Structures are given as C-alpha cells and as structure tokens.
Amino acid sequence: MEHSHNYMQLQPTFSIITITYNAVRLVEQTLLNVLSQSYPNIEYIVIDGGSTDGTADIIRRYESGLAYWVSEPDKGIYDAMNKGLQKATGDYVWFINAGDTLCSSDTVQSVVSRLQKRKALPDIIYGETNIVDEERRSLGLRRLRAVSYTHLTL
C-alpha cells in the first residue's frame, strides 16, 4: 500500500531504535554512526536491557542527541523492541542493533532522496545488508526478497 504525497515537501521523520544489552564494545560505534547522519529529521531512541558492563554509561554520554533512552531489565529483545516502538513518533521506524552501522553519514538522506522521486509513499522500506567482520571488511551482501502483504497479515 502506498500513500500519495507532495514529493517536493517530503521530509519524513525516521524513528531509529537501537536495542542493546551488555554491548559495551559495540554500542558507541552505533551511537556515533546514527548521530552523525546528515538528515535532520531523526528521532533516535535507545533501549538498553539493564546492562551491567558499562553500556549505560556510554549511552549516557550521548543522551543529548537522543530523543529517549532507558536502561532497565526487559523480557528479551522483542520486549525491548516494543518499548522502543511505544516511544517512536516518526513516519518510519528503523531498527539498528548495537554494533550495526549505516553505510555512510548520508544513508538516511539517500533514502529520503529516493522517496522524493516516487509518486507515492511506501509503507515499508527495506534494503540490502552488508555483512562485515570485526575489522569492518565486507563478507558479502544479504539481499531481502520482495515483501508481500499476504505474509505480513494475520
């Protein structure tokens, strides 16, 4: 399903949600990557599952750039994701786990530029994932198949 829009005025807000738990070695690169995005309409939400390894201390250092963050026990990744979704107010939601990064500081802007070329807004946006090792060397792309609404409904 797509929605009509005035593509010249399109400036959607992206709610980017990072879920983390005891990721002290990984979370900072993700925070810096999202906070360095050139696109201005980003609502960044971080949900930490009550880490005990210093993860929350790192998140706290960047809280001025966050729309919301919390560090508290949860019932697992899906509970944490739902907490993030409850706080999200954007037009689109984008999950980026601790340790993951966007391709460049212009990734969100590139997505918006592509949206502006469309005649209608999509309900779902997805792309390829570049799998990398600890040294950030590419191990290959993971391509998603086209999404069908029949698979998304109950």
Residue ranges and their predicted role:
Residues 150-154:
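Conserved small/polar residues in nucleotide/adenosyl-binding loops
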Residues 33-41:
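Short, acidic, metal-binding catalytic loop of nucleotide-sugar glycosyltransferases
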Residues 72-88:
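Glycine-rich, basic loop-to-helix element that forms the pyrophosphate-binding segment
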Residues 1-33:
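N-proximal low-complexity "stem/linker" segments adjacent to membrane-targeting elements
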Residues 105-139:
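Conserved donor NDP-sugar-binding/catalytic core segment of glycosyltransferases
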Residues 93:
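Short aromatic/hydrophobic "clamp" motif used to bind/position activated sugar donors
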Residues 48-57, 97:
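A conserved acidic beta->alpha catalytic loop
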Residues 42-50, 70-71:
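Short beta-strand/loop segment that forms part of the nucleotide-sugar
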